[in-house]
Amino acid sequence: MSIDNYDWLKEIYKNIDFDKLPHGIIISGSKGLGKRLLANEIATKILSKKLDSNELALINSNNHPDFFKLDKEKILLHHITYRKDKWDDEKGQRNVNDFLSVTPSISNNKVALILNAQTMNAECQNALLKSLEEPAKNTFIIIVTDRNKSLLLSLIHI
């Protein structure tokens, strides 16, 4: 699914200056507005400026080595940073901070897309702060939330 059927998303997307994109992006709004679609389009553009069909297939199947999509009903600390004895059945020990610490593999950039960010507690958000405050070169973090007020001010103002 793409933003082509949603005029309001196309309008937002076409006004994004990808040459001046900040490394941290928060997309916030009510459920059902298309935030996930917009976030996926932005991530795709960051990773694949030429829109190569092979890269698009990797992104769409969540198998792109430079794309990390965190889509959990509740985001826990071990999803953001490594904690001993915590195992993620879906991705092994892979977490956002570890992913962002490695240089890009096949793209010029890396993107971590965090969905349902409103479910992160303060400890999770603080663990993410270091990656936002001191981003590695060519890394982008896209945070999607239904409730902007659930995010720490320190996270929002970076």
Can you annotate each of these PLM segments?
Residues 156-158:
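Conserved small/polar residues in nucleotide/adenosyl-binding loops
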Residues 116, 143-148:
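A short beta-strand-to-loop transition that corresponds to the Sensor-1 phosphate-sensing loop
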Residues 119-120, 134, 150:
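Residues immediately C-terminal
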Residues 1-123:
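Clamp-loader machinery-focused feature within the broader ASCE/P-loop NTPase space
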Residues 101, 126-140:
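Conserved catalytic/switch belt of AAA+ P-loop NTPases
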Residues 108-111, 136-142:
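Loop/turn-to-beta-strand initiation segments
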